[in-house]
């Protein structure tokens, strides 16, 4: 085999893997959106067959031989090809350590888990979800031991979502946030509370859907390649490549802001994915490099831009057009209402000040379950205890507590810290962007093009070509510093509450 032939085979292999990913992604997306309730077992059967074929293709002798050949001749490969080979070998080595029957069974379990989670949340019954969740945690612990027996199992999964991330780093990061957020929240509680009554009323779903379309277009999303559906829990997924991106939202007719900011958040994810360089499509380099970087983009658009005074001033006339009852209010009142800082039950509805406390609860619980210090059966009680301790709120039921997120049903254990990291990354990226882009002026006129161009140049185009830490440092021109984020919060909320 010549090197040119091997490179062609490398590209063909990745196209096949992308095709399997496309098919399995469609099954997941269908299950979460429009599939009838009784079809989970049917999808699970198909998923098990596809995942088995995917496993065989990934770990097969031909694939291993091809990648070993390319690795031995990597001096003849360009930067992108070298990175492709590195990532594929990493994936193969991990997958080879997991018995195929266990891998396939786990994929089928996740299909079942998604269905059970929906039913459990609907009825607020954790006991229904408990047996499936126990299997998910047990499998994640077992797979971590297979892949990296020398590592702590929770460290292994943290690093899978954010390359190199450890519990020690998370502990230090969260300690820094707590040091600033807890006193800030205490000062806010001593001030008169912001009035957010204007956000509550009756806002027809049809009008909210029109707002979603408007927001997606304003953000610069290409609606020929990005679709929107409704689900119980909003998410974003790429199907096959960055040319087919799907986002979802959840409409609450009593609160239009819920979906508004879900769409902006998921739209940020979609901008990142669709911003990958086109020559990365159908390769392992396509899409976001880590969940921390991904969340830096989603929460950048949702909060740093979407909840800014400049953008709310721009979007408020459109809101009044869609919801005439808002016309008796001002853009400034809207800005203050959507930035009301107050402990709450639901992570996705949380303000910027308290949001990281929601993440810390999940981090602490995951860490303890992964170490055998907490039983899955005891998660609801411990969840409720930590919400009282961290946020001072009483959890009324499982639906508004331990069952609120879809992440555990999808096997995403170790994901949650990425949200808080992403918020902090985003604040530092915004500070850097403002050196060359008049961000406020862009937002006042609804012109996202210069903002998107900066993100595309510094973040999006690279896909998975660079490691997340290196990509971030290159974009920032300095080391990551979480106090940039806490300073942003202190300045913004200090002004809103007159601290």
Mark where each language-model region is.
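C-terminal, non-catalytic "cap/extension" segments appended to globular domains
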Residues: 2-3, 22-25, 32, 38, ...
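Contiguous, non-catalytic segments that form substrate-binding/exosite surfaces or channel walls
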Residues: 106-258
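Post-HExxH zinc-binding segment in Zn-dependent metallohydrolases
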Residues: 287-328
């Amino acid at each position: 085999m010549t090197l040119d032939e091997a490179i062609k085979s490398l590209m063909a292999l990745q196209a096949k893997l992308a095709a399997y990913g496309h098919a399995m992604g469609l099954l997941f997306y269908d299950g979460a959106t429009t599939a009838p309730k009784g079809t989970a077992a049917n999808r699970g059967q198909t998923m098990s067959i596809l995942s088995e074929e995917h496993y065989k293709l990934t770990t097969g002798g031909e694939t291993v031989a091809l990648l070993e050949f390319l690795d031995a001749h990597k001096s003849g490969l360009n930067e992108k090809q070298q990175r492709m080979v590195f990532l594929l070998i990493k994936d193969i080595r991990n997958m080879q350590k997991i018995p195929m029957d266990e891998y396939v069974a786990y994929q089928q379990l996740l299909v079942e888990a998604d269905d059970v989670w929906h039913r459990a949340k609907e009825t607020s019954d954790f006991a229904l979800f408990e047996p499936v969740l126990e299997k998910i945690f047990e499998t994640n612990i077992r797979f971590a031991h297979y892949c990296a027996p020398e590592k702590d199992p929770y460290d292994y999964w943290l690093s899978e979502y954010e390359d190199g991330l450890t519990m020690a780093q998370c502990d230090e990061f969260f300690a820094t946030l707590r040091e600033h957020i807890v006193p800030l929240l205490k000062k806010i509680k001593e001030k008169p509370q912001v009035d957010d009554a204007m956000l509550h009323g009756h806002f027809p779903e049809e009008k909210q859907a029109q707002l979603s379309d408007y927001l997606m277009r304003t953000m610069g999303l290409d609606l020929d390649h990005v679709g929107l559906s409704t689900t119980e829990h909003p998410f974003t997924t790429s199907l096959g490549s960055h040319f087919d991106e799907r986002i979802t939202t959840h409409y609450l007719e009593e609160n239009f802001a819920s979906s508004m900011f879900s769409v902006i958040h998921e739209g940020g994810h979609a901008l990142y994915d669709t911003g990958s360089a086109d020559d990365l499509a159908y390769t392992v380099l396509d899409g976001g490099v880590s969940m921390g970087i991904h969340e830096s983009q989603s929460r950048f658009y949702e909060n740093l831009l979407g909840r800014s005074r400049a953008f709310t001033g721009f979007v408020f006339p459109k809101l009044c057009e869609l919801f005439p009852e808002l016309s008796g209010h001002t853009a400034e009142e809207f800005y203050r209402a959507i930035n009301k800082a107050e402990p709450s039950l639901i992570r996705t509805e949380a303000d910027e000040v308290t949001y990281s406390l929601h993440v810390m609860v999940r981090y602490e619980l995951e860490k303890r379950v992964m170490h055998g210090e907490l039983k899955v059966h005891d998660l609801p009680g411990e969840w409720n205890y930590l919400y009282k301790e961290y946020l001072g709120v009483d959890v009324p039921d499982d639906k508004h507590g331990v069952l609120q997120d879809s992440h555990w049903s999808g096997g995403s254990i170790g994901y949650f810290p990425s949200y808080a990291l992403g918020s902090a990354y985003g604040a530092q990226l915004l500070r850097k962007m403002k050196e060359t882009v008049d961000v406020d002026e862009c937002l006042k006129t609804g012109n996202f093009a210069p903002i998107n161009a900066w993100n595309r140049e510094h973040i999006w185009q690279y896909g998975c070509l660079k490691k997340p830490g290196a990509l971030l440092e290159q974009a920032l021109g300095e080391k990551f510093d979480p106090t940039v984020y806490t300073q942003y919060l202190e300045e913004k909320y200090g002004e809103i509450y007159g601290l």
